[in-house]
Amino acid sequence: MILPRRITGFNVPKGHAEGDPRSFRADCWRVVAPLHGRVEDRPQVLDVRFTSFMTQVLVLPDREVTALLNKVHAWLGFCRPLVPGGCLLKFVDLDPVGSSFAALGRYRVLSRGELERPVTESMCAELGRGELHQLKYWRKLAERGMIRVGDVVFNFWD
């Protein structure tokens, strides 16, 4: 896996189109409605000005999850519901929801295994200098000096 330039949300040029929250929400409904699920509005746990992603809460008959969409690249993942004060995303696999998002042809759906994989130097070949600087800084603060792919794609570093 190669992390594309600007996936971190740092150094994105002004005027660069971000993902559209309305389209994302509509796609969430399109995917969960056939499964007797719904999309719920919840107070934001994280300040969206400082995140590289947008969220939607998906309520399914057997569980609740948060869908995460990177603001720059249409990379999608899922985690347990976000809690105030929480600083670690707990990624999950979510089929058939993930497959349904992939079938829309607009998203790259990342599995839990991909999201939890440690970031390696070779994955960072396309990242910009500012992004690499941020990774170096946050890696020092991370538990055991390890940053996961999901921490880069869906970050709330300020």
Where are these predicted regions, by residue range?
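Extended, charge-biased low-complexity segments
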Residues: 1-118
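Acidic, proline/glycine-rich low-complexity IDRs
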Residues: 110-158
